[in-house]
């Protein structure tokens, strides 16, 4: 860590009567909190250190000192030093102390004091978003270039660690998949201040997210200001066009803060998937190659309104709506072969097929929140949230295939057809109450939360389908009640402790086609978190952290009804899926805030994965979601940040790990594997002029073969580059991005005594885009003055 907790100098101080001294540090420009600043109290005569601490994430600090006159000294990276002489005769609250950014003017672009691109804090890794991907157009593009973060059409995850909970300004975004991707694409890169990856999140956060929490901190709106940005974007994915238009509006005047994000666009894509199955005992081989092509619009709107009744009491509302439509055509070529003694294959049958799919989905979310702070104790905080999340999905699918002899002659009775409609309705109601109380030099937080969710899944096949007419319906209720407590306490001038405990009670019930689900169970889980930090000086920092997390099943995975891809591949959910759980312990070391090492170990049990069962006689494959994964993982991570020259900076992250994975229900093991794996990512930024208005980036990610979800995955490489140019005093920004300049198709393998299955996924096509962001706005008071001047001139 760049900064360390500075504490009481000796035992002689402890023998005296002390009084509390507290305050809150904020940025002069926009009154946003300044965290992790060094707050020092010195003797005026010889500048001897009396006591010291650091500000928390809200900018608050608290010291204990004896009676007397002292020099208060505050240092924060990127800010001018703050000095103030004060006399302490009793408890003293300094209120808000404003820090001014240390900046100099370079060619009309303001460059503030250099922040490290990465900073390790007590329970999180913090990346400076302005440096990690300066050529990116949107927040989504920044995340694509953030080390360790994986962005796909299905959502966001941490590489090698699974899914995460996504927050914006500490508020959970209750979207997933394409809806989440669309929302993050609507925010311009310039709105993002930092990216926080909480690998050991406090107990106040849900126990979900087996990799932790991803918190996106946006820049605060200026006071007495109305403005925003508009961002058109156009590009190609392979040879197919993609385009979008996103607009952000922000308003802040006195007690009112409002925001509006509008985004929409059109995307078209193509993809390929090949599945190859070999049955050695039967001497047969089956191939299935599918080409996808799709297109569709997406749209999102998100609005927020906050009102500050007093400086210590505020209330707000956020709503969002994200509809999307996707039309996909699949052309499938399936073939059956006999394996000859020579090893060659003899074609037995062809099964060409065509499928058309239309998927419509929409998310609706609403949040009401109330927050109370206390001037007498800046770290004391009370907050209440109430949320609604609604999800609707409807998918219409049809598939038709014909069986043909190698010479093209139709095979009687081999035709396969279905026409299906599936839909999912999910409604969740959530409320939580959180309270934080100063406790000596630390804080104690506790709270409660309740979640009530109902999901209905329906599956209908018409009478002309080869499997006959079917109509199925399942309703699933889940209630989760949680209590938690968090303690953040410095133990001495070198040791700090953060620990928490979260208890969750989960009640489940449901009906399958009118039949009550008797085997669903209610259960209690306890989730501890621990962080222990040791900072011997300002050059070295050590940490020990441990946590237990869980990953609840997606509600679509609870539907047990057959979902046909074709006659050879059938997908099932499971109505009594349990949450997957992961325990992890990590030991970390940081040198000068730039060189980091972490040694960790973890165990995953009840992991949710698709269990594959193939019938060698019929080649029918069943893919069923089940609590079937058990994995031990041990790893060593390293990262390094270099910015010693003015024209170049780089961030290197790498990980070496060993995993032992078994896939199978209960105590059985159907397949899996064990072995060493390695990945490395490099993120480079080049500055082509002194004012840093013309920048370039290039990034590279490589992973050796590894195991995931029971599959043996082949090596993977991706790389891209970007250019950005800023002009008009930072108001206009042009960005050109190219993704997957280096890429390879992903290969997955499963081997059992009865079969071998290989999958080749061509889901990483080259794509490039040109984005333009124009930012506008002005002080509200200034606008009024200009209007008054115009009226005066008209009278003259």
Could you tell me what each predicted segment is?
Residues 627-703:
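Gram-negative outer-membrane beta-barrel transporters
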Residues 302-324, 355-512, 535-539, 593-599, ...:
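Face-selective signature of the C-terminal outer-membrane beta-barrel domain
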Residues 95-98, 139-142, 180-183, 197, ...:
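N-terminal periplasmic accessory domains that precede
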Residues 44-48, 71-85:
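A short, solvent-exposed loop/turn motif at the edges and junctions
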């Amino acid at each position: 860590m760049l900064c360390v907790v500075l504490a009481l100098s000796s035992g002689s101080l402890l023998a005296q009567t002390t009084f509390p001294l507290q305050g809150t540090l904020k940025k002069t420009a926009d009154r946003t909190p300044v965290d992790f600043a060094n707050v020092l109290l010195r003797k005026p005569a010889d500048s001897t250190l009396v006591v010291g601490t650091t500000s928390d994430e809200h900018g608050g600090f608290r010291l204990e000192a004896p009676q007397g006159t002292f020099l208060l000294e505050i240092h924060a990276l990127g800010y001018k030093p703050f000095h103030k002489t004060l006399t302490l005769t009793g408890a003293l609250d300094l209120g808000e102390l404003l820090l001014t950014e240390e900046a100099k003017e370079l060619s009309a672009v303001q460059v503030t004091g250099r922040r490290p691109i990465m900073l390790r804090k007590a329970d999180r890794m913090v990346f400076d978003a302005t440096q990690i991907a300066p050529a990116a157009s949107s927040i989504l593009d920044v995340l694509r270039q953030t080390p360790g973060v994986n962005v796909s059409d299905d959502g966001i995850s941490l590489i090698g660690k699974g899914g995460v909970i996504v927050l914006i300004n500490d508020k959970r975004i209750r979207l997933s998949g394409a809806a989440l991707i669309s929302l993050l694409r609507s925010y311009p890169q310039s709105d993002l201040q930092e990216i926080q990856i909480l690998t050991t999140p406090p107990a106040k956060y849900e126990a979900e997210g087996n990799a932790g929490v991803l918190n996106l901190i946006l820049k605060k709106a200026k006071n007495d200001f109305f403005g925003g940005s508009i961002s058109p974007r156009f590009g190609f994915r392979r040879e197919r066009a993609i385009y979008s238009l996103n607009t952000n509006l922000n308003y802040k005047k006195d007690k009112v803060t409002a925001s509006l994000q509008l985004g929409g666009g059109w995307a078209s894509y193509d993809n390929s998937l090949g599945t190859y199955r070999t049955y050695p005992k039967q001497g047969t081989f089956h191939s299935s190659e599918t080409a996808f092509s799709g297109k569709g619009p997406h749209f999102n709107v998100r609005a927020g309104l906050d009102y500050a009744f007093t400086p210590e009491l505020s209330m707000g509302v956020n709503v969002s709506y994200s509809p999307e439509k996707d039309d996909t055509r699949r052309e499938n070529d399936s073939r059956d072969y006999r394996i000859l003694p020579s090893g060659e294959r003899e074609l037995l049958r062809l099964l060409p097929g065509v499928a058309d799919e239309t998927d419509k989905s929409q998310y609706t979310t609403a949040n009401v929140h109330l927050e109370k702070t206390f001037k007498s104790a800046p770290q004391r905080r009370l907050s209440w949230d109430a949320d609604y999340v609604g999800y609707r999905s409807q998918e219409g699918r049809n598939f038709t295939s014909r069986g043909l002899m190698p010479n093209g002659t139709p095979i009687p009775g081999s035709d396969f057809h279905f026409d299906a409609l599936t839909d999912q309705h999910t409604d969740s109601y959530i409320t939580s109450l959180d309270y934080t109380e100063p406790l000596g030099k630390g804080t104690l937080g506790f709270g409660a939360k309740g979640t009530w969710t109902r999901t209905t899944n329906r599956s209908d096949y018409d009478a002309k389908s080869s499997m006959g007419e079917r109509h199925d319906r399942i309703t699933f209720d889940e209630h989760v009640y949680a209590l938690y407590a968090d303690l953040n306490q410095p133990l001495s001038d070198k040791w700090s402790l953060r620990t928490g405990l979260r208890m969750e009670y989960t009640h489940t019930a449901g009906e399958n086609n009118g039949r009550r689900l008797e085997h669903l169970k209610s259960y209690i889980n306890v989730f501890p978190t621990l962080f222990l930090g040791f900072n011997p000086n300002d050059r070295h920092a050590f940490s020990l952290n441990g946590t237990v997390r869980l990953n609840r099943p997606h509600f679509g995975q609870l539907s047990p009804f057959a979902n046909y891809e074709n006659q050879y591949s059938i997908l099932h959910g499971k109505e009594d899926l349990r949450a997957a759980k992961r325990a992890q312990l990590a030991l970390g070391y940081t040198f000068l805030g730039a060189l980091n090492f972490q040694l960790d170990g973890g165990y995953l049990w009840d992991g949710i994965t698709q269990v594959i069962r193939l019938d060698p006689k019929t080649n029918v494959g069943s893919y069923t979601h089940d609590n079937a994964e058990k994995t031990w993982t041990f790893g060593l991570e390293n990262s390094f940040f270099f910015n010693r020259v003015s024209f170049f900076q780089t961030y290197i992250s790498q990980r070496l790990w060993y995993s032992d994975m078994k896939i199978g229900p209960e105590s059985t093991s159907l397949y899996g594997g064990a072995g060493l794996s390695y990945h490395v990512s490099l993120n480079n930024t080049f500055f082509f002029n002194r004012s840093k208005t013309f920048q370039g980036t290039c990034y590279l990610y490589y992973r050796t073969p590894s195991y995931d979800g029971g599959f043996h995955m082949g090596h993977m490489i991706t790389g891209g580059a970007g250019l950005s140019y800023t002009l008009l005093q930072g108001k206009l920004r042009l960005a050109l991005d190219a993704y997957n300049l280096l890429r390879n198709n992903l290969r997955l393998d499963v081997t059992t005594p009865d079969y071998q299955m290989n999958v080749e996924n061509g889901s990483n096509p080259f794509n490039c885009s040109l984005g333009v962001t124009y930012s506008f706005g002005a002080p509200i008071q200034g606008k009024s003055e200009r209007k008054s001047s115009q009226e005066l001139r008209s009278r003259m």
